[in-house]
Structures are given as C-alpha cells and as structure tokens.
Amino acid sequence: MTRIKRGYIARRRRTKIRLFASSFQGARSRLTRTITQQKIRALVSAHQDRGRQKRDFRRLWITRINAVIRANKVYYSYSTLIHHLYKRQLLLNRKILAQIAILNRNCLYMISNEILK
C-alpha cells in the first residue's frame, strides 16, 4: 500500500478543533481525541440550554408579573389576570406584561382596571 501524504489538511482540522477547545481545562484542551469528545458534549449542552433558556425566561416573566400583581392586590393571582385577559381578547404576551410590570406599573394597573369593567 502506498503512503498518502496529506500533511497540512489533517493539521488544519485539528488546529480548528483546538481553537474551539482552547478555553477547556487540562487534557480537554490538549489531546485531540478528548477535544473532539468534549466538543460534541459542549455542542449538545448548548443545544439543550437553548431550549432551557426559553423555559427559564418564561418562568421569570410569570414570576415578575405575579409579584407586581400580588404586591398591590390588583388581582389575587397571576392566573386570574391571564384568564381575564384572554376573556377580554387582550392578547399581550408575558414578555410584554413583565416589561410593563417592571418599568411602568401604572400602565399595568390601567390594563387591569379595563379588564374589571
């Protein structure tokens, strides 16, 4: 069998992987096999965390809305506010409601008063 000389192509591939893993600790940034394994794990974790991030932000928005509502007794709970919003067909998403709750509470009170009428 003849020898295949492909020197710089494999080196380029390995250096690209090494640049990705340059911030990893120990052998995970030095040994090629462990670098490739860690790269796969890192990308899998990044994919999972993008889904988790969406859930976490939704939980944060709900918590913020609920805190403002309960603090000033506009409604008894978050769920009743959302229920009445849907009943009145005021389709404001939770992200916008959380921004209103933090930055301009009076506006949230005006919205809740409109629902009560």
UniProtKB/Swiss-Prot annotation:
Keywords linked to the UniProt accession = Chloroplast, Plastid, Ribonucleoprotein, Ribosomal protein, RNA-binding, rRNA-binding
Give the domain of life: Eukaryota
One example GO MF annotation: rRNA binding
Q: Check the record and name the CDD domains matching this protein.
A: Ribosomal_L20
The cellular component terms of Gene Ontology attached to this UniProt record, alphabetical and capped at eight, are: chloroplast; ribonucleoprotein complex; ribosome
The subcellular location is: Plastid, Chloroplast
Entry's Gene Ontology BP terms: ribosomal large subunit assembly; translation
Query: What PANTHER family does UniProt report for this protein, alphabetically?
Result: 39S RIBOSOMAL PROTEIN L20
UniProt lists the family membership as follows:
Belongs to the bacterial ribosomal protein bL20 family.
Described purpose of this protein according to its UniProt entry: Binds directly to 23S ribosomal RNA and is necessary for the in vitro assembly process of the 50S ribosomal subunit. It is not involved in the protein synthesizing functions of that subunit.
Query: Per its record, how is this protein called by name?
Result: Large ribosomal subunit protein bL20c
Organism encoding this protein: Morus indica (Mulberry)
